[in-house]
Design a protein with these regions (language model features):
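Cysteine-centered motifs
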Residues: 15-16, 47, 51
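Bacterial N-terminal signal peptides
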Residues: 11-22
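C-terminal capping/lid segments that line or modulate ligand- or cofactor-binding pockets
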Residues: 116-151, 413, 465, 521, ...
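Active-site core of glycosidic bond-cleaving carbohydrate-active enzymes
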Residues: 406-436, 485, 489-493, 502, ...
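Helix-terminus loop motifs that line ligand-binding clefts
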Residues: 384-398, 424-485, 491, 498-502, ...
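Acidic/polar, glycine-enriched structural segments that form the non-catalytic walls/loops
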Residues: 29, 37, 57, 61-71, ...
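Bacterial N-terminal signal peptides that target proteins for export
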Residues: 2-13
Length: 746
């Protein structure tokens, strides 16, 4: 039975604490738990009874491994008894890495390994499109826990910000009174398995025990995760374990309890914690059970040398944003998982990830590019899910940067690769917008326009959430076009006319009406859009920004095409008139001007170049080349990394594979970090996953090097040049028919 259970205040953090220990016969699956490590979650080592060790101390340096371009990280398969079979290869069981990427390492590897805990640590989230778990540097730790689309406020009068959640996976583990911490572990190795979405922390605790901790955000249960722990005694030891639910210190209205539920005849004790965010008072509820196949773990058991303890923590986190009764729903998820058992939970999780990987990118001749493509796809699949009308913030569920709001990043950068490789997830992203059309209508009316003006920064409400110190929230109106183009492309990909009529058409119609009311007519019969911020956010309040006008043209034409597809009559002539009259400015030498009066200034990110791709308005190769050559040196060297992806894509389509690869490498140099290929917005920008940049480079692989293009007639494959050392690129699971496309060197 449990030794004690109570609410404990430690270091300003409220915890629901359970203490237990046991020896358990070997049982299928390995397990895990986590101790929070950042300022908002309880540090490892607090709330521990009779344990020693110094949380936060650094482990000894361990030799680093494989290189990707100029950086040095390690890529190797995690050792497993008997090996782990995948669809493409049998994973290595060797303890040490076998080769250097770019040399002898195979290009179809699925695992990334870290053994360096002294350098700056760059983690990546383990997520299921709803629940995001961010492993930390400290052993068995979580830096953050987040739910998508759940927001609090930055302050009493601040805009919304994605909320940090409760942590139902917190764990403290002691062996003979020595706590697991940075200073007490050795021979440590972290592994990220991208094939089946698990994260592992494996280490020795002195000469007493070897510990293996695995983390999964369960794909089949959007609000639940599974931590599995295995402790193998190297000598006779006494094991003590404390499982907790922790809450950020500024959360309010705490309520908790422990309740026993019987699954058939087996008793399980479930701890629960209820808390509210500090500003908006959003209710978050967590539940967790620490268990073996025999039920809740008993306390104070000796492990003999050679014996193994295996246990699991099944946790759930639910908010009232998504479910009306989060307190009971959180418990129901845990009860369901206990009934299923860890074997079935993991099997279903892996089967669903196998389905996701039907949409894959395979590169022959460049193991580094293969790993990066897989890492980018892994994060894209991890941060969104089918059947949930939610979109992806620029940093996904890895961080609270940009308040976790939804920008154009979703439609222009992350959505396109998902549209090609997973229509179900793509549908979730467009449904997020269609369900918030009323808010866009309201915003347009507030500023004196007709139709729909979508917020530049959107949260769960669908209203404008951009801080007022940024002009983008007031003037970056191309967001409405971005939304409309994404919706039209969903119809072009799927041909789902019923969806178009019910969901897509209202948005296309309202965005077209917005642009008709937004333009100003000139004496020469052309029309202009004045006072905007374009994709180049360095240029404020300009007239006839290239991308703004270009995206409006495409959105207006999409509305016309949708009306024709649905046999709807009305405003088509007016939409066509505006689309034909909008100005795209050009110089005498044929270079496209970014806006009226542009004089060669440095630009933040690609703007004019987006007219060729993705807008497909500039199609003449000579014109595309002129704009590339003019604007490439004018893009800020420390601007967002997705610009290089767009430039490289267009060079590949122009037949210059070497040039495309050179720009691709430039785009990765700085933002890409080991050991898990975390991708930051700019060089040195924090331990986050910049989903926007990853989406841009996925488009480079799919639409650039493989040449895929979405048209009104469906998918076509355009000629495209490969980098000189690549043999081929294969993109699988494309479109509703799940086709395979190959571009191979002849």
């Amino acid at each position: 039975m449990l030794r004690h259970s109570h609410i404990l205040m430690a270091g300003g953090v409220l915890c629901c604490l359970l203490s237990f220990a046991a020896f358990v016969p070997a049982w299928a699956g390995s397990g895990g738990a986590s101790a929070p490590s950042d300022a908002e979650l309880n540090p490892v080592g607090e709330c521990i009874r009779e344990c020693t060790g110094t949380p936060g101390a650094s482990a000894a340096a361990v030799e680093d491994g494989w290189s990707l371009q100029s950086k040095r990280w390690r890529s190797s398969e995690r050792p497993a008894e008997g090996g782990t079979e995948t669809a493409e290869q049998s994973m290595s069981v060797a303890r040490e890495p076998r080769g250097i990427v770019g040399g002898s390492a195979p290009s179809n590897r699925w695992q990334l390994v870290n053994t360096d805990f002294e350098s700056r640590y760059y983690g990546v989230p383990i997520a299921n499109g709803c629940l995001g778990l961010m492993p930390g540097r400290a052993p068995m730790s979580l830096k953050s826990v987040m739910l998508s689309n759940v927001y609090d406020s930055r302050s009493n009068h601040g805009v919304s910000r994605i909320a940090t959640g409760l942590n139902p996976f917190a764990l403290s583990l002691c062996v003979d009174g020595v706590a697991v911490s940075d200073s007490t572990v050795t021979d440590r190795r972290q592994t990220l398995d991208m094939r089946h979405a698990w994260f592992e922390d494996d280490f020795k605790l002195g000469d007493k025990a070897r510990v293996n901790w695995q983390l999964r955000a369960l794909r089949e249960l959007p609000y639940a995760g599974l931590v599995s722990v295995e402790v193998r005694a190297l000598q006779d030891v006494r094991l003590s374990v404390e499982g907790r639910i922790t809450s950020p210190r500024n959360f309010a209205q705490i309520d908790s309890g422990v309740i026993t539920r019987h699954i058939e005849t087996t008793p399980f004790e479930i701890r629960r914690l209820r808390s509210r965010t500090p500003q908006r008072g959003v209710l978050l509820c967590a539940a967790a059970a620490t268990f073996t196949e025999n039920g809740t773990m008993p306390a104070d058991t000796l492990l003999r040398a050679g014996q193994t303890l295996r246990f699991h923590i099944l946790g759930s986190l639910v908010s009232e944003t998504d479910l009306a009764d989060p307190w009971n729903e959180a418990e129901r998820f845990v009860i369901y998982g206990l009934g299923e058992g860890p074997e079935r939970l993991v099997a279903r999780h892996e089967a669903l990830w196998d389905e996701l990987w039907q949409g894959d990118i395979r590169i022959e001749g460049d193991p580094d590019a293969q790993l990066f493509a897989r890492a980018a796809l892994f994060q894209m699949y991890s941060n969104a899910r089918e059947g949930r009308a939610a979109s992806i913030p620029p940093f996904g569920l890895s961080d609270r940067e940009y308040c976790g709001h939804i920008f154009w990043d979703s439609e222009l950068w992350m959505y396109p690769p998902l549209l090609f490789l997973n229509g179900g997830i793509a549908r979730s992203l467009v449904d997020y917008r269609t369900e918030r059309l009323s808010g866009a209508r309201h915003k347009a009316s507030l500023y004196g326009y007709r139709g729909a003006l979508f917020p530049w920064e959107s949260d769960d409400s669908g209203e404008e959430s951009c801080p007022t110190n940024a002009l983008t929230g007031t003037f970056e109106h191309h967001i409405s076009s971005d939304v409309a183009i994404g919706i039209w492309n969903y119809y072009r990909m799927t041909g789902d006319k019923e969806w178009l009529r019910e969901k897509g058409w209202p948005v296309l119609r309202e965005v077209a009406d917005f642009w008709v009311s937004r333009v100003e007519w000139n004496k020469d019969g052309s029309c202009s859009v004045k006072g905007v911020v374009g994709a180049d956010e360095f240029a404020h309040h300009v007239t006839d920004n290239a991308f703004t006008n270009g995206s409006a043209i495409v959105a207006l034409r999409a509305a016309c095409a949708a009306a024709q597809a649905l046999d709807i009559h009305g405003s088509i002539a007016e939409w066509e008139r505006v689309a034909s009259a909008l100005r795209i400015l050009q110089r005498e030498d044929g270079v496209t001007d970014e806006f009226e009066g542009y004089a060669g200034q440095t630009v933040k990110q690609a703007d004019v170049n987006l007219l060729a791709y993705p807008l497909q308005l500039v199609t003449d190769p000579a014109a595309i080349r002129r704009d590339l050559e003019y604007y490439e040196p004018r893009i800020h060297p420390h601007g967002p990394a997705m610009s290089q992806a767009i430039l490289a894509l267009q060079w590949a389509r122009l037949g210059e594979g070497a040039k495309a690869y050179e720009i691709y490498q430039k785009g990765l140099d700085g933002p890409l970090h080991g050991p898990f290929l975390a991708f930051s917005e700019t060089a040195g920008h924090g331990d986050t996953c910049f989903m926007t940049g990853m989406g841009g480079f996925l488009q480079l692989f799919i639409n650039g090097f493989c040449g895929l293009e979405l048209t009104d007639e469906g998918i076509v494959q355009l000629p495209a040049a490969l980098p000189p050392h690549w043999k081929r690129i294969t993109v699988t699971g494309v479109g509703p028919e799940r086709r395979t496309y190959i571009n191979a060197r002849k």
